[in-house]
């Protein structure tokens, strides 16, 4: 049987838009996990906090569940899929209302041994 060399973590229904989340994910894709954590610590973005927690969870999964070494791990895959959208209305002039879409994201981070 083949040896497992990757681990995954997901954060579902995060209250950040997928478009903004993808901008941060592009910064860490393909980097070593230590470099990725350093990048996320200095990224002033709400999505960066969530991605950092998800990345740490993926690292913990790799170490505890599959016995992988943290020093050898690389962020191999990252993606942000659209979650459920909360629909709200903003009151406007003359008794009308405009729709507001509060978007959510499903963040997935996969780390693997290089």
UniProtKB/Swiss-Prot annotation:
Keywords: Ribonucleoprotein, Ribosomal protein, RNA-binding, rRNA-binding. One of its GO terms (biological process) is translation. One of its GO terms (molecular function) is rRNA binding. One of its GO terms (cellular component) is cytosolic large ribosomal subunit. SUPFAM superfamilies: Ribosomal protein L22 (SSF54843). The keyword RNA-binding applies. It comes from the Bacteria. This protein binds specifically to 23S rRNA; its binding is stimulated by other ribosomal proteins, e.g. L4, L17, and L20. It is important during the early stages of 50S assembly. It makes multiple contacts with different domains of the 23S rRNA in the assembled 50S subunit and ribosome. Part of the 50S ribosomal subunit. Belongs to the universal ribosomal protein uL22 family. HAMAP family: Ribosomal_uL22_B. This is Large ribosomal subunit protein uL22.
């Amino acid at each position: 049987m083949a040896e497992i060399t990757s681990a995954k973590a997901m954060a579902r229904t995060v209250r950040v838009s997928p478009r903004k989340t993808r901008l941060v994910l592009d910064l860490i894709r393909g980097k070593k996990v230590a470099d990725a954590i350093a990048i996320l610590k200095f990224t002033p973005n709400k999505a960066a906090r969530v991605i950092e927690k998800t990345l740490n969870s993926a690292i913990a999964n790799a170490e505890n569940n599959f016995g992988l070494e943290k020093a050898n791990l690389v962020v191999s895959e990252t993606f942000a899929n659209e979650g459920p959208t909360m629909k709200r209305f903003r009151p406007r002039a003359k008794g009308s209302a405009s729709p507001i879409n509060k978007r959510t994201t499903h963040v997935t981070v996969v780390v693997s041994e290089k």
